[in-house]
Regions:
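Sequence termini and other peripheral, non-core segments
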Residues: 4-72, 76-177
């Protein structure tokens, strides 16, 4: 357990590492809430985590567009733990792709490259119950509920990612999530 927390804390000190912005339990709504910078960035990161799941589970038999990436990152580990995690992240990647197209009028390259290869689970991936994604953020934002923690993080660190013309989240009605 200590190693998991240590890894999570280390990677969150660098805002360019992988993450899953779990802003709503519905992967499509979670994508809608994301700032433009994350919509652009998180499609590739989600695709990398899903491709890594294929590589880690299927080994040399994996036929996916991207190489392994951040194999030991808590979010990448979470994505490959079971089919429910994988499916949530896949649906979230697709939803981010829809958001990208709606906001920028074009299709993200990772959607073109990865949709079909990642549509199917890696052969041998176990079933399992859905658990909230890990909270990879500074400790000050963490909460028992990952959705609340990610909103704490999103509101607290908005100056890092919000564009000049974007709606800035100051608070959120947690009951609506």
């Amino acid at each position: 357990m200590y190693r998991w927390v240590f890894i999570c804390n280390v990677v969150t000190n660098n805002y360019t590492t992988m993450n899953i912005f779990y802003l709503h339990r519905d992967p499509y709504k979670a994508a809608e809430y994301q700032y433009n910078k994350h919509v652009v960035k998180m499609i590739l990161e989600s695709a990398q985590m899903l491709c890594t799941a294929h590589h880690e589970i299927m080994g040399d038999d994996a036929d996916v567009p991207y190489k392994r990436a951040h194999v030991n990152h808590p979010s990448t580990i979470w994505a490959r733990q079971n089919k429910n995690h994988y499916r949530w992240l896949f649906n979230h990647m697709v939803a981010l792709g829809h958001e990208y197209t709606a906001r920028y009028g074009k299709t993200h390259l990772s959607i073109n490259k990865c949709f079909l290869p990642l549509y199917r689970y890696p052969v041998g991936m176990p079933d399992g119950a859905f658990e909230q994604p890990p909270q990879c953020m500074p400790d000050e934002y963490k909460d028992d509920c990952s959705i609340k923690a990610y909103w704490n993080y999103y509101i607290g660190e908005k100056h890092i990612v919000a564009g000049k013309n974007e709606k800035i989240y100051e608070k959120i009605d947690m009951e609506a999530l």
